[in-house]
């Protein structure tokens, strides 16, 4: 059977889905591709011309690097693939400028971008506070990169999965309820004089229910279905991250097939 994806829940920055008919290797490859292979924009270096705040230049640069930037993959090249040879041009990088005086809290929305569409994804993130008489003037240059290079380029902040198990309660069950009390995830409930599974998605496969069941009525088995939870940073829509990750995996698989054919 071919792997399938079933969307369970989708919000602005979060998505839950089931990856069906997949091996653990495929599930983990998909997770790693979303975190480490899909490109996103991030501040790469900062030129600070004036800083009389209480913060060191390095601290400000680090904070800017971790701010998610709205990313348009069709409008920018990776610097390693750009015609400028990686020196930096409008096709592979963009600048954000700031010139402010205190007293003021500097927010991510205060920065002026070369492109009005390419801005920090969330405009109310506080960067630092300037007090009376303090100034900050800088230029931050952003480019595309991947999480393999640095965490600041990851388009997702959370990308995890768990196996969806198969839980079987057989005819040996006497309805004692020990498994209900032992289960830390509230997976079981009483059903007359028996026990039934009410929330298999919550199961962490800890095995507590199997341990306490003296009747050997419960079995918990692995399946080929995985529950994914993915939260984006705002740099890219989560669906686009998923789609791009699948494209990358397909490209890698095709490249591997070519290598194998050449060897044969």
UniProtKB/Swiss-Prot annotation:
It catalyses: RNA(n) + a ribonucleoside 5'-triphosphate = RNA(n+1) + diphosphate. Its cofactor is [3Fe-4S] cluster. It is an enzyme of class 2 (transferase). Binds 1 [3Fe-4S] cluster. SUPFAM superfamilies: Insert subdomain of RNA polymerase alpha subunit, RBP11-like subunits of RNA polymerase. Keywords: 3Fe-4S, Cytoplasm, DNA-directed RNA polymerase, Iron, Iron-sulfur, Metal-binding, Nucleotidyltransferase, Transcription, Transferase. It is found in: Cytoplasm. [3Fe-4S] cluster binds at residues 203, 206, 209. DNA-dependent RNA polymerase (RNAP) catalyzes the transcription of DNA into RNA using the four ribonucleoside triphosphates as substrates. This is DNA-directed RNA polymerase subunit Rpo3. It comes from Archaeoglobus fulgidus (strain ATCC 49558 / DSM 4304 / JCM 9628 / NBRC 100126 / VC-16).
């Amino acid at each position: 059977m071919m792997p399938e994806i079933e969307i369970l829940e989708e919000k602005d920055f979060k998505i839950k889905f089931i990856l069906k008919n997949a091996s653990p290797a495929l599930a983990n490859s998909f997770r790693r591709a979303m975190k480490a292979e899909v490109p996103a924009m991030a501040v790469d270096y900062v030129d600070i011309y004036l800083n009389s705040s209480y913060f060191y230049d390095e601290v400000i640069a680090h904070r800017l690097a971790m701010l998610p930037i709205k990313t348009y993959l069709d409008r920018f090249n990776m610097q390693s693939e750009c015609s400028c040879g990686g020196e930096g041009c409008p096709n592979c990088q963009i600048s954000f400028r700031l010139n402010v005086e205190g007293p003021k809290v500097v927010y991510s929305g205060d920065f002026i971008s070369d492109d009005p569409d390419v801005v920090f994804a969330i405009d109310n993130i506080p960067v630092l506070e300037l007090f009376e008489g303090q100034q900050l003037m800088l230029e931050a240059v952003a480019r595309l990169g991947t999480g393999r290079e640095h965490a600041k380029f990851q388009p997702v902040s959370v990308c995890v999965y768990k196996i969806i198990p198969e839980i079987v309660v057989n005819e040996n069950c006497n309805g004692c309820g020990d498994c209900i009390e032992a289960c830390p995830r509230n997976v079981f409930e009483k059903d007359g004089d028996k026990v039934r599974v009410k929330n298999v998605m919550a199961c962490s496969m800890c095995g507590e229910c199997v341990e306490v069941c003296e009747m050997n009525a419960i079995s918990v088995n692995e399946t080929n279905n995985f529950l994914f939870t993915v939260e984006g940073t705002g740099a890219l829509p989560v669906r686009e991250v998923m789609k791009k990750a699948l494209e990358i995996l397909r490209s890698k698989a095709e490249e591997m097939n070519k290598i194998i054919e050449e060897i044969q």
